[in-house]
Structures are given as C-alpha cells and as structure tokens.
Amino acid sequence: MSQLYRIILGCIFSLLFIVIPAKAQKEAEVYNVDSSLYAYYQRCQENLLEPVVLSMSDTLFHMAAEQNDQRMQAVALSTRLDYYYYQGNNEDSVVFHTSKVKQFAKETLQPKYYYFAWANRLILYYLKTGRSNIALYEAEKMLKEAQEEDNKTGLLYCYNIMSQIYTIKNFDVMASEWRQKEIELTEKYKLENYNISNTYAQLASYYTTHHQPELAVKALEKAVRTANSASHKILAKLAY
C-alpha cells in the first residue's frame, strides 16, 4: 500500500465523525445503532482482511463500551475473530477468539453472537480445512447445549451447520432432514434467519435430484420470496 494511499485513507477516516454518509446514517437508524459507531464498523469491514483491523476492532469495542452498547461490543469481538477466520492459517487464534466472543456473549445474554461464533466461525473453519469429523464433534456439543437451554437461536445455528456438515460428508438425506428442521423452526417461531433463502434453495435442489418436482417448486418459490440479498436471489434462480 503506497504512502499516498495511506494518507488519503487517513484523511477519509478523520472525516468519518464529521460527515456521515446518508446511506450509513439510514442503515444506522435501521439497525438502531449510533451513527458514528456504525460508520466506524463499516471502516472495519472495509479493512477486514488487513492486520490493521485488529487495532480497529479494539477501538470499536471501546467506543461501544463508552456508549454502553453491548451488541456493538460483541460485533467488535466478532470482527477480530473474522480476521483470523478469513486468514485461514491460524487455528489457535480462531479457537481463542471464538472463546472470547462466546464468553462475552454469554455474559451479556447475546445468544446470536455466541452461537454464530461457534457454528459459523469455529465449526466452519474445521470444515474449510477438511476436518469434518472434528466439525461434527463440535456441532454435537453445540446442539446438546442449545437443547438443554431450549435456545431457539442456538438450535437454528445447530440445524444449519449440521446440514452443511452432512453435505460435505455426502449424506444428502441427512443434510436435507437438518435443513427441514431449520426451516420448520424458523417458520414456527418466526425467527430471524438472514440466510433462510439459501436453505430453501438447497432443499429445492435436493428435491429436484430425488425427483420430487412439486416440493422443489414450492421450496424455490419460498427461496425467492425470502431472499435478502442479490446473492440469495442468484442462488435461488440457479436452483431452478
């Protein structure tokens, strides 16, 4: 990165707390978070693959603490975990920072971040590095804990990660059963599930492969209807 580029970035960064872009302001209102915190969070995301995000995430954590925003503190800790997760070559750091996120989330009663870190970072890390058996072991521990607590958010993450594990293992029937569990839980309790569209699309693909066209069409219709992003819409259309 050139010196000039660093200077330009520094100038832009210094203006963040003076001029908040309209889009960021609107998104901050939607997510019910202070606009300056949200703007700085966006900067963290822009630098997610760079080592500088480690110090930036610390800053975000302390900024959030000053405003007594425990949710954004959890986001800050998760951002640091994200850096190591996407590096893909530092397992000890992934394990350590997963534990940090889980501990903070448990202490502040934020199951969303607790189970996200466990499922979508630690367990997915094991899957990405070809260790599906270790991933399954962790997922079974997570499932047991979520069941004991009757934590619907935790169960949602468990069902989703179980479907991914069994897909990797080429156990398509079992994978589809876990996807169906995820869908039923989401619909029954009207849970927040940003990627539910992908689950419908994957289930539709299973139905198509197993010559169940009517079920496939219904799942695809729901995939399109619940799409929350352009990538969701693309996956749903590809499943047709």
Language-model region placement:
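Bacterial N-terminal signal peptides that target proteins for export
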Residues: M1-L9
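Compositionally biased, low-complexity segments enriched in small residues
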Residues: Q3-L4, V19, E221-K222
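Bacterial N-terminal signal peptides
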Residues: L9-I18
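A "functional boundary" signal
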Residues: A22-Y240
